[in-house]
């Protein structure tokens, strides 16, 4: 099934908007994580970690999931397909890794935010706080991969893609 051009472009704009918003919020999360590690003043720590908690739960996770769902819908309703091209499969895998890692990080983010909000010392939570920098930076790099693949669209069909192309050629009499 091929989408009407107006619907296809609307989905594309929504997908790109979610993806760009997600990258921006991950960048903000990373900056706050760096500020949180370097700060000693309780107000800065509280502001940084409470903001990180809200960014992760209320912006990053919904944007990641929206981008993933919209991307899957777009590929299923277009000639590109979901499993025909390697670059789309890599985008899909990257788009699944990010929310999984984020969901695994959320309890730690909540814990540090709650400790900062209550004014408890965060010295014993240095491991999770460093993890926010590592995972935030890694997440940003992983999010760059789908963006680059979307722009360059490298050649290369999957086995499924080759089989589909062969079947289409055979059906059309080529």
Could you describe each region identified by the protein language model?
Residues 1-174:
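Polytopic transmembrane helical bundles with strong interfacial aromatic enrichment
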